[in-house]
Amino acid sequence: MKHIFIINPCAGGEDHSQTIADEVKTMDVTAEIYITLGEKDATRYVEDYCRQHPCENVRFYACGGDGTLNEVVSGAIGHEGAEVTCYPCGSGNDYVRYWDGVDFHHIKGLIEAPAVEVDVMKVCYYDGPNLKVCYALNTMNYGFEAEVCRAMDDVRRKPFIGGRMAYTTGIVKSLFAGRHNPCRFTVDGRLWKEGDLLLASMANGRYEGGGFLSAPRSKNDDGLLEITAIRPISIVRFASIIGDYKSGKYLDRTDLQDIVSHCRGRQVTIEHDSPFYIGIDGELLRGNYFEVENLPRVLRFAVPKK
């Protein structure tokens, strides 16, 4: 098997290229290193490589955050000989938190890791008259969470309020602008929610925002999306539940049943007359209609042993 390390030199506000390259050179494997040139470059590179080497077994190492991992997965999806794993060095690194206690920071462990089959979300959406397709590995968010992603983009690389604090900073900024989000929401062809929502999320992973356990019951290989919606609430009530939202305990609180809804499904649509933002693995898309289909076990993802 060939091993290709795809490094985002801007991930996490620090260039890890040399550290990773030095460790890779000590490994007795056939390996290459590719430094990304900008947004979506990882997807382009992986797609091109798989197209040019259709019979080759290859493992791609996404060296960056969840956005870099998403780009690598988007390029590898559908190519039979391709596997993916992650060396997490971004600002979030949430997808790999699914495997609690597993260390993804050792190159040797990643190279020797067995691959498991995981689900991937296929997302079709309209950007104006044009239908576009992309993929999500970890989470998709509507409403408040997407507004948080927008705010995060503004502060991600700023000192003190950026980096690992970016998600918390985004929450504070969005409290005053992103608490009422109208939409029509269907699950497996049936109307689930219509009207104002604080937020809605669809997940195969469990964590987002640098450690918020927003989908504690999710499984990434069962073919089902973990779907949660929360109705608009006051800032005071929001402040009273944010701790349990971060720890994942909010789904167990009976006093939140009037505002929290939860279900599982394979296919979701979200629509509104006016364009809105959706967060996909921490990145933003804009449209007025999104269709999400969970593709069961379509990606081989390497997970180191504990």
Please report, for each region that a protein language model flagged, where it lies by residue:
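Gly/Ser/Thr-rich active-site loops/lids in small-molecule metabolic enzymes
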Residues: 157-166, 208-210, 216-237
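Short Gly/Thr/Asp-enriched flexible loops that form oxyanion-binding sites at enzyme active sites
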Residues: 68-82
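Short acidic/glycine-rich loop or secondary-structure boundary segments that cap or lie
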Residues: 145-148, 193-195, 207-211, 235-239
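Glycine-rich phosphate/pyrophosphate-binding beta-alpha loops
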Residues: 141, 145, 201-215, 284
